Every structure is written in structure tokens, then in C-alpha cells.
Amino acid sequence: MEVEPPLYPVAGAAGPQGDEDRHGVPDGPEAPLDELVGAYPNYNEEEEERRYYRRKRLGVVKNVLAASTGVTLTYGVYLGLLQMQLILHYDETYREVKYGNMGLPDIDSKMLMGINVTPIAALLYTPVLIRFFGTKWMMFLAVGIYALFVSTNYWERYYTLVPSAVALGMAIVPLWASMGNYITRMSQKYYEYSHYKEQDEQGPQQRPPRGSHAPYLLVFQAIFYSFFHLSFACAQLPMIYFLNNYLYDLNHTLINVQSCGTKSQGILNGFNKTVLRTLPRSKNLIVVESVLMAVAFLAMLMVLGLCGAAYRPTEEIDLRSVGWGNIFQLPFKHVRDFRLRHLVPFFIYSGFEVLFACTGFALGYGVCSMGLERLAYLLIAYSLGASASSVLGLLGLWLPRSVPLVAGAGLHLLLTLSLFFWAPAPRVLQHSWIFYFVAALWGVGSALNKTGLSTLLGILYEDKERQDFIFTIYHWWQAVAIFVVYLGSSLPMKAKLAVLLVTLVAAAASYLWMEQKLQQGLVPRQPRIPKPQHKVRGYRYLEEDNSDESDMEGEQGQGDCAEDEAPQAGPLGAEPAGPCRKPCPYEQALGGDGPEEQ
């Protein structure tokens, strides 16, 4: 009986073919080592490297799209819910039937105060929170707080609405500061992954040239604001598909309104106290709020699962290791920089113009003349105009960077002057297309303003150790402007337009003055970022260069090393410790060069 041959040949065993396999390669002890453990014969290192960095670039694009979509859904849910609840709570019949003498108007005023007043303190804690949690996790936490605010509207009481509104007010500035930092970091990463060969030639610790990431930053900011401005349109979906079915027409709601536009005083003076024909059933309200809650939860999952980290783990350790006291002080120290001081009026105007579009123009001009049932379509016109015009921020690829900002300011200047002399008659719809046209044009100016400012800050402050401070200052001033608008909501329309006009002119003049100073070669004074102080000296911190060292500090360090004498070889042929590097513990033990003996 013949023995069946083994399925696999035994190494070193002589078979019918001797000590060679079917490819003619010797088997057993004489087999060459390269044939066993060598590289794959068809492996192309350059092609694999190209594919690797292509996947990295696609990952960066995925991060930008996920962050943009998450913020769009979050703000669409937040603005839509807030608008729907304020309209329902305004109707006195709804308040009396649903809530009796609970004092719903007082709760609403406290809720709005929590949303608008709390961000004033954000400058004190935002950089600390971003450095403590990290950029991505700060975004996730802030989006979760927005979802918490949505969930509390299931049970509308003082102890649910007001605390959640205060928490939401605390999360506004951290969300936007971390988002601006995140988009800027993604543009820098995309540059690194696109020019990886240059990075290999220059060395891993060499910073890329100044402004090299600017083209990618322009594209990513245009994508982000194209998505974000759609949130104003998404916020109108509950109004269109649900609330408009219960509203009275303009002949009832505007029966006592005498003047609109530039002649108006406060917010809708004389507006009817009853705006609902029939009261919506509680079951229908729960269904709408459940849909909004599901969308908010989806936004949380998108930020959590699809957004990658903005920094490497070692970079985040370095950013936190400068000291919490320094992190707290650095936003205030950056006021020394004349560029930030010149941009503060633009920061304030950026907050003014968004609130004016959503409250001043939409209510004082649009609703006052066309009725509450057309508010949603007016804001959709603003949203679509702003979203489509965010692409105009790409003009910075071919034109000077001041062109988008100045163009947006010029457009808003013309519209503001026109609104000074426009007082539309109440309950007149013959020229309703003018309202939609003005809203769309205002959206164009808003898009140029937002994309221009965010791109400018990302170009002027591209050091990763400064970006969270800069975007915190930017959005804190926006929050201050929104607080001022909240305080002045009862002013006459002419006073609001005058404040808007003066701020706009001052912002444009201050910005052009800043650009002139930069062209003259005036060097801004920036605070020094302290070096990381690590409690544990691991292998990561024995590298030659510090990942958080600025260019000026690096040049000074190299100059100091050039003056020093060449280090002598240690015992047993130990190699020199390298320029500007302390000896590792092993070298200190061999050479007696530890800190105790210096």
C-alpha cells in the first residue's frame, strides 16, 4: 500500500525532485535568506507611499465634510426649535390653555438671557476647555449640549429650560472656536499630505513655508460656510411643514400695525397677541420635537464617528504642557498684536449683521409687511444666498485677500443705506419680491464676511499653538455683539441701522489700515508661547526639536548652539548628544553629565 505524499513539502526533506522546489530554488538549510524573508517581489514603495497619502488626503476631506454637516444639522435643529417655541409661547391663548399661570413669557426671557449673556464669560474658560478636552472632543461636547437643550423642550419648565439655556450659552464660543481651529488644522494637514516629498527632504521637524496652506484653507472654509448657511433653511422646515398650518393670515396678525421698516419701533410694535387659529395637539408637538432630537443625535454621532483628531497625541500633550495658568492668560496677551486690535471692529460687525438679518430685517421689514406666515421663506432666501455665495470666498485664490472682505462690506453698506429710506406699508404684498431679493443680497455679504474673516485669521496665525486663542477672541467678540443686539432690541429701527452703519465703516477702515501697516513691513508683537514642561521624560521628549517651538525661538536656539563648542565623545564611543539637546539618561550615566552635576 503506497503512502500518500504530504500536502505541504517538509522543509529540508529530499523529495522526488531532490533539494529543489518546483521553481528551482534550493530548499532546506541552503535556501537563501532573501527568498524567505525578503520584500515582496512586486512591491513598489513609491506607489504604496502615494496611495497612503492619497488615503490621508481623502480622510482630511471626510473630516471637513463631517464637521460641516454636523454643525449644519446642529444649528438647523437649534434655530428651528427656538423659532417654533417662541412663536407658540407668544400666543396668549396657547399660554393660557397649555400652561395657565406658570409665567411662560418670564421663562422665555430668562432663557434668552441665558443664551445671550452667558457667552460673555467664555473668554475665561474656552482655551482651557479646548486644551483639556482636545479640539475634536470639545466639538463633540458642545454639540451634545445643543442636543441637551433640544431634549429639555419635552418638558417646558423653569428648571429645565433655563439651566439648559445657560449651558448652551456656555458652549457657543467653545464650539465655534474649536470649529475654526479644526478647519484650519485640516488645511495644514492636507498641505502636509500633498507635499510629503518636500517634508521628507526638509526633515520631520521643519515647518512648512509661511502661507503654504492658504489655498486649501480657502477651499475648506468655503465648503464649511456653504454647509453652515444652509442651517438657516433647514431651521424653517418645522415652520413650513407644521406651524404654518396653524397660523392666522396677515389680515389678522397685522391688524394693529401702523408702520414698518425704518419707521418702526422695537420688534413688531402692535402685532396681534393671538397668532394661532387652532392650537396644535400635544402629540403632534412631541412628534416634531422627537424628529429634531433624532437629528441632533445624528449630528453628535457624525462628529464622534467621522471627524478625526486635529492633532497627534504628542502634539496635544505639548499644547497642554505649557501650563494652565499660561493657557488662561494667553488670550489676553494676544491683545498686544496690532492685527487683532484692528480686526476687533470687524468681529463686532460680524455678530451685528447676522442678528440684524434674522431679527431686524426679517421681523421689522418682512413680517411687519408680509405677515408671519412668510417669515420662513424670507429666511430661506437669506440662507440660499449666503450658502451659494460662500463659494465667492475662492476669489482669494486669484485676487488679494482684502477683496472678499471689502466687497462684502461694500454690499452691506449699500443695503444699509437703502434700508434707511425704506418704510414698506403693512399688509401689502405687491412688491414682496423686493424683500426676498434684499434678503438674498444680505446673505451674499454675510458669506463674504464670514469666509473672509475665518480665512484671514487662519493665514495670519498659522502656528498651531496660537489658533485656539485667536478663534476664541474672534467668536467672543461676536458673542459680545450678539449680547449688545439683545440689549438694544427695543430701540427704533433708525437707531439700529445707525449703529450698524457706524460699526461697518469703522470695521472696513480699521481693516484697510491693518493691511497698510503689514505692507509697510511693521512686525506685529506676539506673546511668546512657553515651552512645554513635561513631568515625565519619556523617549518622545528626547528629540532634537520641540514641536511647539516657534520660528523665532528655533533660530535663536540654533544660533546659541553654533556658538557652543562641539561636544566631545563620551566614554565607550558614545555619539554626541546633538545640537540643542540634553543628553539622554544613559549618556548622563556614562559621562557624569546629569543635571545634578551641572
Swiss-Prot record:
Modified residues annotated as Phosphoserine in this record: S547, S550
Biased composition (Acidic residues): 544-554
Induction: Upon interleukin-4 treatment in B-cells.
The organism's place on the tree of life at top rank: Eukaryota
Transmembrane region(s): 64-84, 110-130, 132-152, 160-180, 223-243, 285-305, 343-363, 378-398, 403-423, 428-448, 469-489, 495-515
Signal peptide as annotated in the record: none
GO cellular component, one term: endoplasmic reticulum
Outcome, altering L148A: No effect on interaction with TLR3
Its biological purpose: Plays an important role in innate and adaptive immunity by regulating nucleotide-sensing Toll-like receptor (TLR) signaling. Required for the transport of a subset of TLRs (including TLR3, TLR7 and TLR9) from the endoplasmic reticulum to endolysosomes where they can engage pathogen nucleotides and activate signaling cascades. May play a role in autoreactive B-cells removal.
Protein's name in the database: Protein unc-93 homolog B1
